[in-house]
Amino acid sequence: MKLREVKPEIRVLGIDDGYYGPEDDRALVVGVVMRGGQWIDGVMSTEVTVDGLDVTDRIAEMVNRSKHRPQLRVILTDGITFAGFNVLDIKKLHEETGLPVISVIKRRPDVASVVSALSNLDRTEERRKIVLRAGPVHSVKTRRDEPPVYFQCAGVEPDVARVVLKRTATRHRLPEPIRVAHFIATGVTKGESSSDA
């Protein structure tokens, strides 16, 4: 699906993971369906392996089996690492769901540091390729008096992704669907949500 027009109530899926402890081998991942950055239409979830390599497949399954799938126009994720270093392949997720994917990061990522940290895990080369495959890092100021957010995207042009991010950042510089997914995921896994996505 080619995203050309970004309506104010564009159906967006925001995804983030919850808390997991050192003894946990699985982590909760929550998706929140919103109309723009205003109304919640639904919630979905899955689990992924801590420091595994299953996040792309698990999120694709979660999206494709959802009753909300026909309405969705774009997927927003909180970065490309979930449950430690379970690295999301945004290009593969785009291919498997047919939806544009925008991975949002609060601070400019240090790709070299991420790649270096991966050397402590199994299947290092596979993880490294996924990180590099995410493509160039872009930026956008979603709120006038706040710092920019950074993003990588698949299946959507950066200029269109910027419009999506501005439309969905209604109360914070991060898109509201990601923030709500974070609140739900941490609230469920910690018993109370943390304030910062």
Swiss-Prot record:
Residues annotated as transmembrane: none
Lineage: superkingdom: Archaea
PANTHER family in the record: UPF0215 PROTEIN MJ1150
Family membership: Belongs to the UPF0215 family.
Protein name per its UniProtKB record: UPF0215 protein MK0057
The organism of origin for this protein: Methanopyrus kandleri (strain AV19 / DSM 6324 / JCM 9639 / NBRC 100938)
